[in-house]
């Protein structure tokens, strides 16, 4: 919204039909473009868009080319999209900015951290994007915020837009974001200090061991009454990130007489709420989302909620 309003207000913004994404809260790219004061020009088809499609729609009133990275879904099969380097060359030729909404955003090489590959912000900037926006939470592991980086001249223009003052973060958000970014200084810091990366990297064997240890400490009557078992599971990153990837995990599975929906409400309404999910008509509490510092609290919550 801020990028488009600052760089292309009153002009046309070109975007591929296959990139008109919807994010959480039913916010859609076409609505954001309209709200920013721009007119959306869609090109290509849902599964295929070519460079010529973009070039054919560029006019004197074109304000920008927008690329929205589909971080919360993937189109597979008979598909084709334009390389960012080619779009960058076209945008430079026509003297219009190339704006990239990266969505979740990654600033580290995930494969070096033992995680699935995800293109980095740096790689998109090197490929020629004029400005790139991404989330401060999700894959980055920080506070909920939007981050914009790119060419200095365009960033200055965005910074001077009145919307910037209305949308700027508070000091607490900046402080948390700074602390999060400092964890990326070395690979060791990321794995030890960044909670998101720590949770991603906990192995299934480790989680199974933790789960069984907690179950042993529960009163036997609670375990029997609620049919609590520790089982292997697969989980997703969530927050619209890495949509095709599954992460091996382990969970408490409740297979007792109480209905899964009722059990879920019981946990959510507790003084210290515990959020789980329902799968195969059983309530699950997945250990992939439980930091090591909260394992004792989880045990206490299980006892107080179920006794």
Which residues does each PLM region occupy?
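Conserved PLP-enzyme active-site core in the AAT-like
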Residues: 1-184
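Conserved PLP-dependent catalytic core of the aminotransferase class-I/II
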Residues: 15, 173-174, 178-238
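Long alpha-helical, hydrophobic tracts
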Residues: 21-23, 27, 299-307
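Structural alpha-beta junctions
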Residues: 90-97, 219-226, 307
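Short acidic (Asp/Glu) and glycine-rich catalytic loops that position anionic groups and cofactors
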Residues: 103-104, 153-159, 186-196, 243-248, ...
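A common structural junction motif
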Residues: 165-166, 268-275, 304-307
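Short, amphipathic alpha-helical "lid/cap" segments that border enzyme active or binding sites
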Residues: 174, 178, 295-299, 303
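Conserved C-terminal alpha-helix-loop-beta "cap" of PLP-dependent enzymes
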Residues: 208-293, 298
């Amino acid at each position: 919204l801020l990028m488009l309003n600052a760089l292309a207000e009153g002009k046309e913004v070109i975007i591929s039909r296959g990139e008109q994404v919807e994010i959480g809260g039913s916010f859609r790219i076409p609505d954001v473009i309209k709200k920013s004061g721009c007119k959306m020009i869609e090109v290509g088809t849902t599964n295929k868009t070519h460079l010529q499609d973009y070039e054919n729609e560029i006019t004197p009133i074109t304000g920008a080319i927008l690329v929205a990275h589909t971080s919360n879904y993937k189109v597979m099969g008979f598909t084709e999209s334009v390389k960012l380097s080619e779009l960058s060359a076209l945008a430079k030729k026509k003297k219009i900015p190339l704006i990239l909404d990266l969505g979740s955003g990654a600033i580290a090489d995930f494969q070096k951290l033992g995680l699935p590959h995800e293109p980095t912000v740096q790689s998109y900037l090197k490929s020629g994007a004029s400005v790139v926006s991404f989330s401060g939470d999700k894959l980055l592991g920080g506070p909920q915020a939007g981050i914009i980086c790119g060419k200095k001249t365009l960033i200055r223009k965005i910074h001077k837009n009145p919307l910037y003052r209305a949308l700027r973060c508070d000091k607490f958000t900046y402080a948390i974001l700074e602390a999060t970014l400092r964890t990326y200084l070395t690979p060791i810091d990321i794995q030890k200090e960044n909670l998101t990366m720590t949770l991603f990297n906990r192995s299934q064997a480790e989680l199974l061991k933790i789960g069984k240890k907690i179950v042993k400490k529960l009163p036997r009557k609670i375990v029997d009454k609620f049919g609590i078992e520790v089982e292997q599971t697969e989980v997703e990153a969530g927050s619209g990130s890495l949509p095709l990837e599954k992460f091996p995990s382990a969970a408490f599975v409740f297979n007792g007489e109480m209905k899964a929906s009722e059990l879920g409400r019981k946990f959510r309404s507790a003084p210290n709420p515990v959020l789980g999910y329902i799968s195969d008509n059983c309530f699950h509490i997945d250990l992939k989302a439980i930091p090591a510092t909260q394992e004792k609290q989880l045990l206490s919550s299980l006892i107080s909620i179920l006794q």
